[in-house]
């Protein structure tokens, strides 16, 4: 900076850049900040302001307080609030501040005339000259801009558009022309739209009903397709797990670890179906390439067996009544039902940790749980199956003796096949399931 101000306190310069002030207004703002602060304890006699020109001291000013802050020297003095009225409130704060002691030379200042323009610093004179120049220049601009509308049009016609903007204006004009062309082409289409709306209103309701029926049929077909069901993937996963259980059960039966009598009755029907499919080589337990076809075959057999079994049960329920002796003997099973005990059919193939977690639910060990709920239930089912097989055998003997005269050779063959298969599978689960499966062996081919 060519010319700037500095504040001196007790002949010690504040050498930071913040204390170099370029003009009188900047000096005044920082001086008021210093004196209005609560922590300021200073006497104005020790305060001095120096103006520098290229780091050379040029003019010295002193500070005093008479109804406002004053900067003075031997030639001139300046009341800051007269030049900058926004600092009038600051003067009252400084007067009421007890930490500030006034200058003793204040009487010398009162004898001088206030605010002579001749004795202002040069920077203040330059500020006044700049403001006068700006005001005069603004007035001339107003006179030039206040042009009548007729003269304005003449001046616009004289001016020419530069070449840089002519292409842009032409493009905009072509775009507007295109919009006009499009609007002209769309106008004749409006009557066609009205005709279309009238035709749609005249369409009978029967056609709408037909379209609705077609859409409903399509949705029903898509829902009936098993491949589109969300649960189809879950069913295939269950089928894959059943394949693995049959594979492990077969190994255990061949090795003598598991007896066919001890198979869970919930899995006995599935075991028989898997055995038939394995004997016909219709299923591959080592791969899942044709798992969807295998699932379809298995599902058909399973549904037919279940349907036949339900019919037989309904007939038996209508003919027989429940005995109280059987209810008393089934006390253990009833206890398990009352407690809602659920035993998975893959219990014997579960790891030891899962078996322990199942037993802990009922407050028992694994051995106690198996003795109480699994072994007793298996023995009970075996005894019931033996009784049913004996009754069925006696009834079959009676029927054979009565119908021995009307036996055909084809029926003899079928009965011989059934008897062989029943001997092979007599130890498995439920006899009704076995008879249904044996009938399916004779009528289903893969």
UniProtKB/Swiss-Prot annotation:
Q: Where are the compositionally biased (Basic and acidic residues) regions?
A: 397-418
Q: Where is there biased composition of kind Acidic residues?
A: 317-333
The ranges of region (Disordered) come to: 198-233, 309-337, 394-431
> Where is there biased composition of kind Low complexity?
199-224
What's the protein here called? Answer: Uncharacterized protein L204
